[in-house]
Structure formats: structure tokens, C-alpha cells
Amino acid sequence: MPALTAPEGGTPPIVDSIESFRDVIQKLQSGVGPIAIDAERASGFRYSARAYLIQIFRRGGGLHLIDPIALHGSQEIGLLNTIVRKEEVVIHASTQDLPCLRDFGIQPTLLFDTELGARIAGLERVGLAPLCELLLDISLAKEHSAVDWSIRPLHNDWLDYAALDVFVLLDLRDRVEALLLESKKLEFAKQDFAAILKASPPLPKKDPWRRTSGMHLIKGRFELAIIRQLWQIRDTVAREVDIAAGRLFSDSIIVDIARLKPQTKSDFLSLPSVRFRLKNERLKERIDFWWASIQKCYEIPQSEWPEMRARGDGLPPPRIWKERFPLAHAHLTHAKAGLLELSTQYSIPVENLITPEVARTVIFDEGRENSHAMSTDLLERVTEKLISLGARPWQIELCAPLLAHALTCDEPLPPLISEAQGSEQGPESE
């Protein structure tokens, strides 16, 4: 199996001037067929999720590496977007790249997602490198996937890696499409691709500070108040300076402060997590600021301390259904077993047949704990619920009868081995 280290014809230079950008637009306009696009962000280094490199490839239109920072706000972006909106755009794992592409000004109207398409086609390993090995018989190195793409100038070997990522996408798209046609699932994939483009941005998570790593060590509400305030201060500063929050002030430091409550600046600097991170210039240059912030945390009145457990707005966790909602629990066991069987029959992962949250919402039935008999009315109500929750027509056709049937089964199934294996991704996962 050949290992590719650079695209055929070599890696092109970075496009970082208006003149070279106009040349790119002309070349892409003369190309034919779909346009492959990829983007590199600086996750783990920067707070923002903006693109720091955009790669574009089109047959007959060339391979191009665009610097979106240098070209940000230029009128020529609109010309590029006009071309893109007229063609199918090929992206691997598009939900990761679409937000930063749209932020730059690229707004596809027709999508082919090679990662999602491969999932629906029934392939188990759907990362770009494994798919290239399986479907194209070529090997791609992935050693630069987690580097800091915000630095300038970018290293040549990084650019080779980035160019290859988009250079293989059109051939990969054709192979994935062939698999989907062969398995009669191309229409499934097309509906999912269209749904991705129509989807609204996700709502902000409630109480994101509760996801601080190490929260299992916290035993009291005062400690939670300290964590919340330091998390919020860190988030504000990280956003302003565009530095990844954990790189600015780590979760381990926040949790140590909440647990040990240093009373002096010396105590703070003596914390193991702080001593370890003092090598980090980002922390050293703000020591006085962080110590002042810590002192303010100690002044938070008890009336403002958060509850130990967040009050959820969504469904109760399935682990409590057996005791509190026994009928919903029984219905869920049947839904889960049926979805696993359907997943095997169609070679589609359960979470792509129907998302766990959607399946649980239908089955929970707003906690009514009703027994049902199979009827046209029940099937119609399940179908309407799935539509309201954003399920695609193909998902509704396959899953609505199954979920309606599950609502008629009031005796729970035993925890089968196959169900336990699928629990992480099935409708009972949290």
C-alpha cells in the first residue's frame, strides 16, 4: 500500500493575497464537478473555533491552500461562495468544519459528507485515513492533526498533510457513493446530508462549568461556587485573548483551589497543579490577577451557592426509569432491542438510525406511563413526534413502526448481552 506524503504535482503555496485569491477563484470556476473542502482549526490552542487554513480541490480547478486570516473580510470571498453554492461540496465529518467555513463566508447548499456516508454504507472505521486505506488503497499520515494551525508561517510538512486531506476527498466520495448505491442507501445519506445543512446551531449547554474535569472530587456547594466563578472568569479572559481556556488556567488548578482553598498567595503558588503549570507563561503573567480572583470567590454569599445537582430541563436519566417510570423502562428495552436488530439488518449504526435522545423522547411519552394497543392512531402520533424532533423521512419509515410497537410492550426484556454491548450508543446512553 503506497504511503502518500504530498499530493500529485506537489503542495501549492499558501494563498494569502487578494491577487492570488482572485487567481484561485478563476481556476476553480474553470473546474468541473464537486468541490472538496477541508479546514484546519487550532483546537486546544485558541478559544475561537475559526479556521486557520482552508483547503479546496476541484478536478480541473486545482488544489489550493487558503489563509482565511489574511483574507478575512475580503470581497472576493463572496465570489468564491458563488461558485461553491452552485456545486456539490464534499467534506469529511462536515459538522466539524461547517461552522468555521460559514464564519469565513463559505456556505454550501449541496453536501456530500464522506464520513457520514461511510457510516450509513456500513463501514466500521470511518476516519479519513482508514477509509483511504480501505477504499483507495493508499496510506495517509495523521501526525499533524492536532498542531497549532494559528502559527505563522506554517511548516511545510503540515501543509503537505493539509493538502493531502482534501486531495483524496473526491476519489473517496466516488467510492462511498458506489457503496451507498450498491446497498440501496444513497437516498438515506442524501437526506442526512441535507439535514446537516438545514440544522440550526446547537443551543449553548446549560451550566457548562459543571463539565470541569475533576468535579467528582467536589463535595460541597461552596466548592461549586468557587469552580463556577473561576470558570466564568477564565472563560471571559480566554475569549478576549483567544487562548484555549485550559491552556490559560487549567481545570486541575480550578478544582485544587476549590478543594484546598489557599488562604495566601504563597499557598496558591504551592498547589501541585500550580507548580506544575508555572512553566506556562500564560499562567505566570497573570498570577496577581488569578490570586485576586480567588480572593473574590471566598466572598460569594451562601445564598448564591449553586445546588450540588443541576436541575435538568430534559428527560430524566434512563437509569432511574426502572424505579420511577417502569412502563417507560419496559418500552425502552423493547425499543433498544428492536433498534439493534434493525441496525444489524441495514448495517447502519444505531445512532444513525435514530439519535438516542430522539428515541428516548418518543418512548418516554412525557412520563405519562400509559399502556398502548397497536393502532393507526399510535403510529401516526409516533410519526408526528419523530417529524417534530427532526427525524429524516427514511428514519421515520424504518423506526416509527418499531417505536410504536415498543410502546405496546409493557413487560421489560432481560438485559441481553447484545443490548449491553450497544448501550453506549443505543437509546439508553446518556
Predicted features and spans:
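Short glycine/proline-enriched turns and hinge-like loops at secondary-structure junctions
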Residues: 46-49
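Active-site-proximal helix-loop-helix substrate-binding element of RNase H-like nuclease domains
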Residues: 4-7, 11-14, 55, 60-170, ...
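Accessory DNA-binding and partner-docking regions appended to nucleic-acid-acting proteins
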Residues: 156, 176-430
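N-terminal accessory regions of nucleic-acid-interacting proteins
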Residues: 1-35, 39
